[in-house]
């Protein structure tokens, strides 16, 4: 356990906390809406679902869609997001801060609404 603390585990959120990905998420959803010619939620409404699981978030911003329509939109979003994933970077100072915490003996973890595969992909791209 690190010195002078009762905590040995620190859990970080990924999108918008460690990774500067909010703009990519918003733009990906807007592009999907444009390609499907459906009403585009506001940037604020889209931003409000960041951190939720994809299905849960999309139910909130597309409540009028049936299950099949939502699954199609989710798949289109995944494809659009992957086109932009190389543009995601860590916020300034995050890498140094995380390395510093790890060197002090803290266990570090990430909490996210992403799938495990999605998080692994994002981690690999941000190295």
Task: Describe the role of every protein-language-model region.
Residues 2-48, 64-67, 103:
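Active-site neighborhood of HAD-like aspartate-dependent phosphohydrolases
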Residues 6, 83-110, 116-124:
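Short, acidic loop-to-helix structural element flanking the phosphoryl-transfer center
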Residues 22, 43, 47, 67-74, ...:
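Short, structured helix-loop boundary elements
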Residues 24, 53-56, 96, 117-118:
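Short alpha-helical
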Residues 33, 62, 123, 127:
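Conserved hydrophobic residues forming the short capping helix/wall of the S-adenosyl-L-methionine
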Residues 41, 56-59, 80-84, 118-120:
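A short acidic, helix-capping loop that chelates divalent metal ions and anchors anionic groups
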Residues 50-80, 92, 100-102:
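A metal-dependent, Asp-based hydrolase signature
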């Amino acid at each position: 356990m690190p010195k002078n603390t009762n905590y040995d585990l620190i859990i970080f959120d990924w999108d918008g906390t460690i990774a500067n990905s909010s703009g990519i998420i918003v733009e990906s959803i807007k592009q999907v809406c444009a390609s499907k010619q459906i009403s585009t939620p506001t940037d604020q409404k889209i931003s409000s679902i960041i951190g939720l699981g994809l299905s849960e978030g999309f139910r909130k911003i597309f409540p009028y869609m049936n299950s099949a329509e939502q699954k199609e939109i989710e798949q289109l979003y995944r494809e659009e997001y992957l086109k932009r994933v190389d543009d995601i970077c860590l916020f300034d100072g995050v890498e140094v801060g995380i390395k510093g915490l790890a060197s002090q003996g803290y266990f570090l973890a990430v909490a996210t609404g992403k799938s495990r595969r999605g998080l692994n992909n994002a981690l690999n791209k941000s190295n």
